[in-house]
Amino acid sequence: MKHRRIAILGGTFNPVHHGHLIMAEQALWQFDLDQVLWMPAGDPPHKPLAPGASKADRLAMVKLAIADHERFACSELEIRRSGRSYTIETLRTLIQEQPNTQWYWIIGVDALRDLPQWYQAEELARLCHWIVAPRVDAGDAAQVLQAVAAKLPIQAQILEAPTLTLSSTYLRQQIQKGGSIRYLVPPAVEHYIRQHRLYLQP
């Protein structure tokens, strides 16, 4: 039986933007994936959530952003989990539910640098292949990967994709000061943000 190839793209998506979509699309083709599974975080242990949108809002925005892509899907696994969202627990659940799958995890180079400090990092590193997404402001991806590989048994490749400075932090700041986010997020996401008056307060 041919194993399906699925990459998980986790994040707070607070809000989701075109940088996330470009990353997912490039990973899909570079690694010949069957699917990219978007995984909005519930209560991430490594990154405190900025205020402005509820779990339900962040989930809804991801679903709107990927609605027209037949090989993108959204999981509610972490959003619906009570307590902290640990990556290793998510992976164990997915592996159990879909055993005939080669799992990948798309990770930004900034998060990769901290991977050795993640919960049960050594076992986590072994559970899947890692796709490292470069970032303009996060250092050389190859050097970071080399440093992490010296500490963890990791199989990883670097994603060949445009490096954008666009971030959810920037978008929240734009909204708070009344600026435009047109062309930075999908139109449906912008409409949702405006309709629900998200991110207006700092």
From Swiss-Prot:
EC identifiers of the protein: 2.7.7.18
KW Phosphoprotein (keyword) present: no
Family annotation (InterPro entries): Cyt_trans-like, NadD/NMNAT, Rossmann-like_a/b/a_fold
Pathway it works in: Cofactor biosynthesis; NAD(+) biosynthesis; deamido-NAD(+) from nicotinate D-ribonucleotide: step 1/1
The UniProt record lists the keyword Nucleotidyltransferase: yes
GO biological-process terms attached to the record: NAD biosynthetic process
Catalytic activity: nicotinate beta-D-ribonucleotide + ATP + H(+) = deamido-NAD(+) + diphosphate
Keywords linked to the UniProt accession: ATP-binding, NAD, Nucleotide-binding, Nucleotidyltransferase, Pyridine nucleotide biosynthesis, Transferase
Molecular-function GO term, any one: nicotinate-nucleotide adenylyltransferase activity
Family to which this protein belongs: Belongs to the NadD family.
Purpose of the protein: Catalyzes the reversible adenylation of nicotinate mononucleotide (NaMN) to nicotinic acid adenine dinucleotide (NaAD).
Record's protein name: Probable nicotinate-nucleotide adenylyltransferase
Annotated source species: Synechococcus sp. (strain JA-2-3B'a(2-13)) (Cyanobacteria bacterium Yellowstone B-Prime)
